[in-house]
UniProtKB/Swiss-Prot annotation:
Homodimer. It is an enzyme of class 5 (isomerase). The keyword Isomerase applies. GO terms for biological process: tRNA pseudouridine synthesis. This is tRNA pseudouridine synthase A. The active site is at D51. Belongs to the tRNA pseudouridine synthase TruA family. CDD domains: PseudoU_synth_EcTruA.
Amino acid sequence: MRIALGIEYDGAAYYGWQRQKEVISVQQELEQSLSKIANHTVRVHCAGRTDSGVHSTGQVVHFETEAIRKDVAWTLGVNANLPKDIAVRWVKQVDSSFHARFSATARHYRYIIYNGAFRPGILGTGLSHYHMDLDVQKMHLAGQMLLGEQDFTSFRALHCQASSPVKCIEYLNISQRSQFIIIDIKANAFLHHMVRNIAGSLIEIGCGKQPVDWLKTLLAYKDRSKAAATAKPGGLYLVEVDYPSQYDLPRPPCGPLFLEL
């Protein structure tokens, strides 16, 4: 039997999603909790492996089990055994053809900047702070130059292992709610550090250090060293993963929760 779960986590205390030796990971904590409820060793497959310090409100995983449990066991039961910064949001039994990673058609990331004079004491690990005024309209206009299928070498981490730098951005929107600036970006797939590298360059445009058409120039360079520094991980969230409608997976609000209030 194959089961899918929606997972939310604050990544500040973890060395990323993926299980690693001698350091704590989100995957390790989730598998330990699931194994207690299933009464056997559980290994999960995820939609996207987030880096150290990166969060998620919309991670999707699947696992195999022969254990017959009510849905409440896979939600409340697993949550009772998880640290407070990781939570199961939903559960659904899925067809054996479903794969959390390979069935996904798109991933939606959200980068949140607190644009204020002083860094916040609360939510500090769930935001990126930038003190200079940012022009949201210029940032949004600049972001539209990244839409479609393009070579994103200039926004690719040097150690990225992807076979191709060509990805397709379906949607890129930048909005503001009070002092929060929100960068929403959806693509078929992402290169390592791609969203944070794009965010870093958008910030340079927003504060007036670079012109609105700078991203177009960076795409043409195909050179990571020409773009801005990588934005900090604390502001980044994997908020949603798209799948074919045949799987009929739940679609809760993207979050994070403090933006929904």
